[in-house]
């Protein structure tokens, strides 16, 4: 049952659906959405029945057009704002989820929207999607992980061009840059995303989780260290009988 104001959370079989639900405001990320996402992501993480999650935006115009700066820049004090952010580390929670997360991206994918998408494991874009990081032009830095996740996806030069100039990429440019996995017509966005989710959900949950863990953790290791990690995780998989 959905009891949130800025999100819709549903489970169908073993697939979790998280929908950013502020369509009149282009699904911009505000304080309430942060708190509700923190709660929902924790529920997904702790639910053994969830094999994969889909993240999408409500409405026709945007996945997420950024953050609501009127809220985040008017906190009672910078100290309180930082403390609350540390206590509700939504981005860290995204990155630590054991289940794969697939982002279905349409319309505006800007600011916190692109940073949220970059925390997902697979990104499917509709042909009308636009990607950008306008924060520098607003006098702030992309502090929701954009300076770290974007260059890891598209490389240093392309990331700096986007971050320092605010240049937007259309869907095909994003695909060529490696920012998204596929580009599909708008009407095929959710069906394509669900097809991928169902494929993943058809496999052993443990094997999927271990494969994700080995891949992501291995990126920060040397090749030899990564191979050792892979062996340890495969042994764990065999011991548990999967």
Question: Could you describe each region identified by the protein language model?
Answer:
Residues 1-16, 47-48, 60, 166-172, ...:
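C-terminal alpha-helix plus adjacent terminal tail
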Residues 1-56, 92:
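Conserved CoA-thioester-binding segment of acyl-CoA-metabolizing enzymes
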Residues 15-19, 54-56, 76, 102-104, ...:
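Structural motif
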Residues 18, 22, 37, 55, ...:
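Terminal peptide-recognition signature
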Residues 33-36, 83-86, 116, 189, ...:
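Hydrophobic alpha-helical membrane-association signature
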Residues 34, 69, 87, 91, ...:
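A general structural signal for well-ordered alpha-helical segments in protein cores
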Residues 57-93, 109, 139, 222:
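Glycine- (often His-adjacent) and acidic-residue-rich active-site loop
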Residues 92-206:
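Crotonase-fold acyl-CoA enzyme core
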């Amino acid at each position: 049952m959905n009891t949130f104001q800025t999100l819709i959370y549903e489970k169908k079989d073993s697939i979790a659906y998280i929908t950013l639900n502020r369509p009149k405001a282009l699904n911009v990320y505000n304080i309430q959405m942060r708190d509700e996402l923190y709660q929902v992501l924790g529920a997904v993480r702790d639910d053994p029945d969830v094999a994969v999650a889909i993240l999408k935006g409500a409405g026709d115009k945007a996945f997420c057009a950024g953050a609501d700066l009127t809220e985040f820049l008017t906190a009672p004090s910078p100290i309180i704002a930082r403390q609350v952010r540390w206590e509700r580390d939504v981005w860290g929670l995204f990155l630590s989820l054991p289940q794969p997360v697939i982002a279905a991206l349409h319309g505006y994918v800007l600011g916190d929207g692109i940073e949220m998408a970059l925390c997902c494991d697979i990104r499917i874009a509709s042909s009308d999607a636009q990607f950008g990081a306008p924060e520098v032009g607003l006098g702030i830095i992309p502090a929701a992980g954009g300076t770290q996740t974007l260059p890891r996806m598209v490389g240093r030069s392309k990331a700096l061009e986007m971050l320092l100039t605010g240049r937007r990429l259309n869907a095909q440019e994003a695909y060529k840059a490696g920012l998204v996995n596929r580009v599909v017509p708008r009407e095929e966005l959710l069906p394509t995303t669900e097809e991928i989710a169902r494929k993943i959900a058809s496999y052993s949950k443990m094997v999927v989780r271990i494969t994700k863990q080995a891949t992501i953790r291995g990126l920060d290791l040397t090749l030899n260290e990564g191979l050792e990690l892979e062996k340890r995780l495969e042994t764990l998989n065999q011991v548990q009988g999967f």
